[in-house]
Amino acid sequence: MKLAVLYAGQGAQHPGMGREFYEDFSAFRAAFDSAALEFDLHRVCFEDPDGVLNQTEYTQPCMVAFACGVSAVLAEKGVQPSYVAGLSLGEYSALEAAGVFTAKQAIELAAYRGKAMADAAKGIDCGMTAVLNLDRDALAVCCEEASALGCVQICNYNCPGQLVIGGEKAAVDKAAELAKAAGARRCIPLKGSGPFHTRLMAPAGDALAKRFETEAFGEMQVPVLFNCLGREMPDGSSIPALLVKQVQSSVYMEDTLRRLGQLGVDHILEVGPGNALSGFVKKTLPGVVCASVETPAQLDAVLTAWKEEQ
């Protein structure tokens, strides 16, 4: 079995995520509790009485804290991936799993990134729209034509038949209109999203670059496939530079998955919450065994089933 672990990005968060892992595993608790944040992580992640979990400055550290905790449990159970990757924010979780960041670092960096992205989006009438069943080159032409109305770019290449555009709302709406005329099956506006992974996030990239100057990066123990490349990091590349680029550049998840297939990966474990990445895997690599994990029961079931395969 050649295993890759994928880490979810924001969007599938919900109150209560991670509570069962927290109750059952000291390794999860140690990772989850390692960061010093300006808010009560337990209160927001497990209960969210104030309804702030969907605000990106809260979403990001909560998602990464969950992922780091699950990674600690996976390590405790002897799960050793050959490769790791993540969708957008999930790249920070992947880097923690690979040994580049400590759990404390990853969670605190996610909080910083979330605030920087929220700040960059302030005052912009922005949006993101999923575009179904249109070729990426055709959609790029639509975005170029609509850019007369403002910034609009393809921000996510998720899987065959699913792309996401983002930027300033007028331009995004125009690009979606052109996409439908060009043959897109559906265009679905995404609620509560900023212009993530577009050039409008340049201020967030600048903020991250400054923060990374004070961070120590560990040695990568597991190969990471990077969002802005769709593959492993070339020799001579800089992880901080790739993360600065990532926040303001397209996420090449379909390319990442195809690369995992080329590398011989035959099993993929998605660390949720949610199972969006598993859906992308099934459309991109239909021959690969894939499962998503959000609870201890799900993890036990997956590991038992995979052990019986061998």
For each feature predicted by the language model, list its residue ranges.
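FabD-like malonyl-/acyl-CoA
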Residues: M1-L139, H267-A297
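Alpha/beta catalytic cores of group-transfer enzymes, especially the acyltransferase/condensing modules
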Residues: Q10-A12, L37-H42, A98-Q248
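Non-catalytic positions within long, well-ordered alpha-helices that form the structural scaffold/packing
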Residues: A75, K180, R258-G264
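Short glycine-rich catalytic loops that host catalytic nucleophiles or stabilize transition states
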Residues: P189-G192, G261, E294
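Short, flexible loop segments at boundaries between secondary-structure elements
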Residues: L229, V289-Q310
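Amphipathic coiled-coil/heptad-repeat helices and related helical stalk/stem segments
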Residues: Y252-M253
